[in-house]
């Protein structure tokens, strides 16, 4: 009898204890993807209040190669991280003087896609993939609010890939590509919401060991063993050459509201870029006879290309919105130069150019009709006119752009190839439509 009474008492006590620990979900703070939000600078600049949340779907989870993530709009040399170029027609919506052609720029963090977070709790996202062809990819993001108005975010992209042919030793894991991309971003808003600051540091360090393709078949024994699928036995044309691209870019955007409403806001953008481009062939004296290099009378044993680029770009302007209309007007001064570290012929003086421009947008409350225009004029002869319109998912757009050729296209000097040309500016007109 005492045993039954004790058991009943124990059951009643535990039931009360367990029921006391149940918390009503309606009163408990739950953190997750819904409490993590971010904005893009282009939306803020164009007077759009648009909030995004991290995507938890697995639609593109299996896409590892950057080329696949771009919907195969780029083409590389067949291996992860190798030099890539755009394969279609793409109009650059810019009129400043380009500095260089970047074969590895695709693998850097793109300024227009950098996310400025606001998190209620620390947010971390990590993705690691190791492939059967000796490649590895790591993506790591950590974002955390220091307080309710200040956030700091770290984003890292790291990958490496091994050679598929042209091995110089017995190992089948010789490195072909070594890549680091890092950006640190922060954003701050004052108590009254009048002042907003967005800033980031963007770094790229990308190295590719150059192979120059497979050696000509006239040097190979065309036996059944040679032409078998064991392509790892093929030899590369180059064995001691590599390219490297190195970026250090700093960016600041800040704005201050002159009125409580969105009618008048001052903004300022500042970009400082420092890029280094390397190409080194330590066996150039032997390799210059290959098909990789053009005919040259150089007697150098080593080929070294080392060029630095610097640029300082600013925009000062006024923006706002009123009854469905949004506008901004700005003046954009820019300084840039190139320094030839190994060949002074590649060095240019500091060059200065100035642009003035503006945007005017309109959208109905339900976004049934959206109109956008952008005009920009430069002292370098550059001109940009863009018009876009969307009505119930039917769209039309027009672009007219005149832009100078890049410093790289205008002139370049090296041991094995040189040119100096007086190209005209590129002129583009584009008309496009879109429909469901």
Positions of the model-derived regions?
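A short linear-motif detector with a strong N-terminal bias
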Residues: 102-107, 130-134, 176, 230-233, ...
